[in-house]
């Protein structure tokens, strides 16, 4: 018998078995257990937040997306030390670009401008810049991110930045295009064209970065845009293997292996890279 029958007319549920000893604890426990058992599906947007930035050129504020670094889980980097993280490609969010005046730079360099550099930016960038409406997006696309890095590169050239800064921007663009290629299926003419364009940009900017950092190591003192000498040498060694510059790669590897400042982990990686160089040289002979 339903002891609570008749309550329906008041809009209240009168069905179910009456048990005044049940205070709802059992129901809450079942709900909590179900919640714990259901995994939370995290996506890229869960690791981002909006942050206001003030442009040092035009003094206008704008919003950029930034990564919640405390929540990031590092994954194994690529052979050339391109950083990888779970759920989000942090490199996409490495540039601040003012939508009003066109000035852009990597975050670590954005506010560091001399009076003369501000003048050069205003004359060479802002005077010719045509603002465009910023798209509303929860996460940055690779094309959008690369666009901002390219703005950072022309700003770096306009302000006569160190070669290490320009080379690092080129390296990041190459890394972004390489990551993008992994997301594009080679199944339609449109996608094949996208892959072809990405490959061209990847190789072009990777070469600029390689040539740039080779010169940087002989013309600048470390750190090179925040990277120590060993890190840059190791990146260059991998890039040299990519371009089959085996003499350059071998010299860099030997220097790293014999250096007391090189970590054990990096020395192990250098030994693996040395084996790769030897194997490729043997393959070329055969």
Regions found by a protein language model. Name each.
Residues 49-51, 94:
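Short metal-coordination and nucleic-acid-contact micro-motifs, chiefly zinc-binding Cys/His arrays
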Residues 54-59, 98-101:
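Short cysteine-rich clusters marking metal-coordination/redox-active sites
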Residues 60-88:
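Short recognition patches in nucleic-acid-associated and regulatory proteins
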Residues 124-153, 158-194, 227-239:
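Amphipathic alpha-helical repeat scaffolds of TPR domains
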Residues 165, 201, 205, 221-229, ...:
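Structural signature of alpha-solenoid helical repeat junctions
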Residues 172, 231-238, 242, 268-280:
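"A position-specific structural signal for the A-helix of alpha-solenoid helical repeats
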